[in-house]
Structures are given as structure tokens and as C-alpha cells.
């Protein structure tokens, strides 16, 4: 995936589970693994491509069971509580945000508010390159997956795994930033079946079904990877990787 190779090698003790990790029982883990195998088959078999709607319904049924099993492992937090820590983190790491504040706008979400008048073409914000989250600036552990086909050829997948690594490893320097990220987005992955039905007859339906299928395949694939390999990434994500956290 084009990452620089000047990273420290990972020898010796691997990262242990973070305080945020909660283990599934062996029985529930086995049940989840079986569901993931079924999910991978449904989302990978080319025979289902010509039956995209029925395939979507089958995938949704399996995912509902998956999310019920993983529900106990999903936490929520109030993003606005981390604003002060986030702004301090920015300035301590060289960002310039004078005259701006992060606020919660009623009926919307978090955003930037000007606390002073700015002239036309005036620079209002300056963010160092080192504070731009990417697979080059974060999650050096990802190097162990550099030959994984999904990580290697799909930059958005590599970035998603990098975000999870930094979120769940101990003492991540990116924690103030990650705590500010939204917990949900307005995409087809958050739509219920009844919502998807409304897209029938629209040219966007096929793209939406394909997106849902792709994410289901990626999730089931990485679930198997993290459960069956021993490396720094699996040590961090094995017990915290869930469908909802991934998508």
C-alpha cells in the first residue's frame, strides 16, 4: 500500500488487551465465527450477483444476528465532552486555530465557529502535516499487514484498520482526535431494509447494494484474520473488532 518501511520491527512482547476490551464467551465466539463464515460466502460468491436484492436480504439477516452477539461490546460517548482536550491537543502539536472554537450547533452536530472577524483571504487555520491522520502518520503496527491483499490494494480499508488500531491500543497519541469522530454517518450502511426498498427503481440502488455487500465481505474477512493470526494488529483488535466499529 505504499507505506514507508522505516518502522520499528515488532519483536518481543505484543500489545495486551486494552481496558476497553470485553471478551465474548467461547460459545458466543464460535457462534460469531460461524456467522462470519456464512457472511463471507454470501458476500463473495459471484453466483449471488445476479440476485442482488435477495442477496442483500440474506446478508442483512446474518448481520442482524452478528450485531446482536457483538452488541455488548459497543460503547457510546458524548463527543462534545472531548472538545477542550481536542483543542489542547491540536495546539500542543503545533496547530494554529486562533479565533476559532469547536461548538455543538443545535439541530446539527459539531462544527467550527469564528470568534473574531477574519478578512478576505486571511489564513484562519494551520494544521501541521503530522496531525493529518493517515497510514503514514499513524498505526505503525499496520506494517505487519502490508502484504494483505485488502490492505495493500484498498487505501480506504487500510485507513479504517489504522483508525481502529489507534482507537484501541494503549496510550495512542491520536485519542483526543479519535474521540471527536462521529459514531454514525448518513450512508447506505446505516439504512434499514425498509429504507433500501425506497431506492427500488432508482439508479442508486445497485451501488447501495454493492456497498453493503463489500463491507460485509471485508468485515467477515478481517474477523477471520484477527481471530486466526498472531501479530501486533490482531493482538489489539481480536477482542474489539465488530461490524459496527468497522463500518
Where are these regions (language model features)?
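Short, Gly/Pro- and small/polar-rich lid/capping loops
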Residues: 95
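SET-domain substrate-recognition elements in eukaryotic SAM-dependent protein methyltransferases
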Residues: 15-82, 88, 98, 105-108, ...
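PEST-like, low-complexity acidic/proline-rich intrinsically disordered segments
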Residues: 1-13
